[in-house]
């Protein structure tokens, strides 16, 4: 990342100094990025590791190691705006037209999903972010921030991100998704993959209005009228508005069938039985119900669309990259005040994006799928390059330890409390599996007339 990019972010945020300091704003941004890169280290150790990069940026008095108090005050003085501007400059899919795994049906594969980050317990953080409800209605646990991002599946590059306190108003994933849609980051030529949390009409219609195509998993109980059956086994349907859905539900309870097609978003309904056959063990079959705005089965056959949905897991992998490998497993963010938390999250996103950019660059040099480039090896190489001032070695080191082609494996997902996690005997990770997709036509007859 060129230093000029940081200088532009500082200028765009209006953080230029009125006088020269030991730690000017550009140096503070570098230091905050270092805190995200070396998250488990204290301020003093981070400053020592980055001394070779910070000393040329020091003020006219020359460089000496600042105290932790001076570093904390410098962070507060800079605020979150420069890091937000820097992330905006770095954000993007990182995929070219020939990047393996980045495209499907002529569209850029992206995924939309959220996660949470724990922040330190302080009065300021509680006031800004709130705390999750505890037992017997009492507030308990750590305050949390909900982060939602739009990620390119092929490279795990972060296209956009938004976050808010979990207990704040309008902090649900659906509200945050509408915020990303309003920013203009969802555009025609994208195929957005999302889970069942985004299958309601208000959020799906907002996302579709951007011109991007959608592929969303829906609940088995969600009402989707079958208007007609298509040659590939999928069906024409409509994601009804809440008012239309209620009108048809009331009519069905009275034993009536309304003749008109409900108002809403036209979609294709795809129901598929996914059979996973491990090399040793018992096969298991799961029903997957999807809706998509790819309405033409000739250009997007149902079986291929259903197989494409598996790429949504890439955003889960990207959150593992951020929370486990970059921040550290189970770690809190550092700051005890909201502005510092906001600054840290933008810095973490910048570090993740820079690491994914290094992965994408390394993969491009050998026409490899970016999945073959290890995130952890690339991140360690970047850390080592910064501390030894040998910039440029991260790409070659990442290429020297390629991952094998990704295998199909089965690891059933569990949602457990902390106590249950300690007690659960989780099934072992299986070896290579075979996945079979069978498209099924919905058994229920349509309650609507028409072709």
What are the roles of these predicted feature ranges?
Residues 1-49, 75-78, 85-88, 104-108, ...:
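Single, function-defining residue in the core of a domain
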Residues 92-98:
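A short, well-structured juxtamembrane/interface segment
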Residues 101:
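Noncatalytic carbohydrate-binding groove/subsite architecture in carbohydrate-active enzymes
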Residues 53:
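Short edge-strand/loop segments of extracellular domains
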Residues 59-78:
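Major-groove recognition helix of helix-turn-helix-like DNA-binding domains
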